[in-house]
Amino acid sequence: MFGKGGLGNLMKQAQQMQEKMQKMQEEIAQLEVTGESGAGLIKVTINGAHNCRRVEIDPSLLEDDKEMLEDLVAAAFNDAARRIEETQKEKMASVSSGMQLPPGFKMPF
């Protein structure tokens, strides 16, 4: 089933990948990404754990209606969440790039 040293090599690769993934997850937790809405009038910054770190609202919006402001804040948060997800996928893809994974194999993240 496995060629000479194949199973040992596979186990070694799995261990290396596990170490890389742990390091990458630690790096991702430290990431901060800013999402925007309303052409940059609302900015929301979240970290890799999707915790909101900062909300910035342009003073000109404070005179507008409350519902629009709430919608813009939600849109900015969603933009930040999308950006952090993309960043996480890119970083995790780099971890698995050296492994010989079977076609269609999906990582557990």
Swiss-Prot record:
GO cellular component: bacterial nucleoid; cytosol
Record's keyword annotation contains rRNA-binding: no
An annotated Gene Ontology molecular function: DNA binding
Family annotation (Pfam families): YbaB_DNA_bd (PF02575)
Record key words, sorted: Cytoplasm, DNA-binding
Subunit structure: Homodimer.
HAMAP family for this protein: DNA_YbaB_EbfC (MF_00274)
Protein purpose: Binds to DNA and alters its conformation. May be involved in regulation of gene expression, nucleoid organization and DNA protection.
PANTHER family reported for this sequence: NUCLEOID-ASSOCIATED PROTEIN YBAB (PTHR33449:SF1)
Annotated family: Belongs to the YbaB/EbfC family.
UniProt name for this protein: Nucleoid-associated protein YbaB
Organism: Escherichia coli O8 (strain IAI1)
